[in-house]
């Protein structure tokens, strides 16, 4: 007589593995230029990055190359990415640059600034719909950042100094 409990456990594990694989959405487009690979998503494709349920700390920063405060704070995000990437830590820099600027401006920017954190582009013109899905309190201004781990989640519509960013990250680690 087969061990049904073992079969059920095995099927459940396989189910969750498949769900995890398929929850990572496919990009709308993948750009490759000058050794940089950049994925572009609509909001439905980006949303899984905003709602992972595992023991990893996620830092998601919304920025653009034309946003002076965004560009000013990016080195702080890069420094924190380098400092914490050995732990269960994932940083994603979500560019809100226009699609026509990806190859001419975003990719050269990534290369010139030597950005090591994962950069993706959000290409979804229906901002009035997706902004409130990111955070109810978000006006749409950038820079904006979400930091979350499991059920703890905070949204910031502000620029960060290095010290402020590290303090917030540490509040999720400790």
Model regions and ranges:
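Thiol-/selenol-based redox modules, centered on thioredoxin-like
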Residues: 142-174
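A short beta-strand-turn-helix
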Residues: 37-58
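Bacterial Sec-dependent N-terminal signal peptides
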Residues: 1-28, 174
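Conserved redox-active cysteine motifs that mediate thiol-disulfide chemistry
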Residues: 62-79
């Amino acid at each position: 007589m087969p061990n049904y409990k073992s079969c059920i456990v095995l099927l459940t594990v396989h189910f969750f593995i498949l769900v995890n694989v398929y929850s990572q959405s496919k990009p709308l487009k993948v750009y490759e230029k000058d050794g940089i690979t950049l994925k572009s998503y609509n909001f439905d494709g980006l949303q899984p990055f905003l709602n992972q349920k595992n023991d990893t700390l996620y830092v998601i920063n919304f920025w653009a190359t034309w946003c002076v405060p965004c560009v000013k704070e990016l080195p702080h995000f890069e420094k924190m990415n380098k400092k914490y990437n050995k732990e269960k830590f994932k940083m994603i820099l979500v560019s809100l640059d226009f699609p026509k600027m990806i190859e001419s401006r975003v990719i050269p920017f990534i290369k010139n600034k030597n950005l090591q954190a994962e950069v993706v582009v959000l290409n979804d013109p229906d901002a009035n719909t997706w902004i409130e899905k990111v955070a109810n309190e978000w006006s749409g201004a950038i820079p904006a950042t979400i930091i979350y781990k499991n059920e703890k989640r905070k949204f910031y519509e502000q620029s960060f100094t290095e010290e402020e960013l590290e303090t917030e990250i540490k509040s999720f680690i400790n």
